[in-house]
Amino acid sequence: MYLRKISAPLMTMLLLNGCAYIPHKPLVDGTTSAQPAPASAPLPNGSIFQTVQPMNYGYQPLFEDRRPRNIGDTLTITLQENVSASKSSSANASRNGTSSFGVTTAPRYLDGLLGNGRADMEITGDNTFGGKGGANANNTFSGTITVTVDQVLANGNLHVVGEKQIAINQGTEFIRFSGVVNPRTISGSNSVTSTQVADARIEYVGNGYINEAQTMGWLQRFFLNVSPY
């Protein structure tokens, strides 16, 4: 009987703790790497040099830049994100109104009620409103990450994806990146800045006790949601 009294509150707390878990939805979903497709079987054409041989996979002419163009090729992304935004608004409204009405003659029996044989009426109204708001946001992200080509689009653009994991003490930091790269923007050092990548998805998250310390507790979130203030 004593164990039942203890187990019931304990199970309730465990259920509430499980419901309090909020899963993180990553911006870069799916696999973060790609393997090159196996080379097709060579067709004899009478030449000594066969470009489709496995040992010559990725062959490029001597005077052509070495740029990624196949699935599995790598590319270095230079992260240079600096976004700043500000917004302010204000509004003022004022309205005044006055109305008067007078009657110089009135029945004699209303003299005692109205006074001096006349009836006067005056209405005055005043309404004033003022509002002001503002918001500022600044975000800076810098670094490098090497990604892999996982798709070659019909127009020649490359869809790239990559992930970097860094373990620090008892926590792990994840940097994920995906986007579409125009091969013409790739420099001679096989790199491109993140500002030249279309549909860029940049994610920097971590796990461990430091990340858990930055998460609000389930009971605190409960009171935050139900509190009217």
Curated annotation (Swiss-Prot):
<dbReference type="GO" id="GO:0003774">
    <property type="term" value="F:cytoskeletal motor activity"/>
</dbReference>
<dbReference type="GO" id="GO:0071973">
    <property type="term" value="P:bacterial-type flagellum-dependent cell motility"/>
</dbReference>
<keyword id="KW-0564">Palmitate</keyword>
<feature type="signal peptide">
    <location>
        <begin position="1"/>
        <end position="18"/>
    </location>
</feature>
<comment type="function">
    <text>Assembles around the rod to form the L-ring and probably protects the motor/basal body from shearing forces during rotation.</text>
</comment>
<keyword id="KW-0998">Cell outer membrane</keyword>
<keyword id="KW-0449">Lipoprotein</keyword>
<keyword id="KW-0472">Membrane</keyword>
<protein>
    <recommendedName>
        <fullName>Flagellar L-ring protein 2</fullName>
    </recommendedName>
</protein>
<dbReference type="Pfam" id="PF02107">
    <property type="entry name" value="FlgH"/>
</dbReference>
<comment type="subunit">
    <text>The basal body constitutes a major portion of the flagellar organelle and consists of four rings (L,P,S, and M) mounted on a central rod.</text>
</comment>
<keyword id="KW-0732">Signal</keyword>
<dbReference type="GO" id="GO:0009279">
    <property type="term" value="C:cell outer membrane"/>
</dbReference>
<feature type="lipid moiety-binding region" description="N-palmitoyl cysteine">
    <location>
        <position position="19"/>
    </location>
</feature>
<dbReference type="GO" id="GO:0009427">
    <property type="term" value="C:bacterial-type flagellum basal body, distal rod, L ring"/>
</dbReference>
<dbReference type="InterPro" id="IPR000527">
    <property type="entry name" value="Flag_Lring"/>
</dbReference>
<comment type="similarity">
    <text>Belongs to the FlgH family.</text>
</comment>
<keyword id="KW-0975">Bacterial flagellum</keyword>
<feature type="lipid moiety-binding region" description="S-diacylglycerol cysteine">
    <location>
        <position position="19"/>
    </location>
</feature>
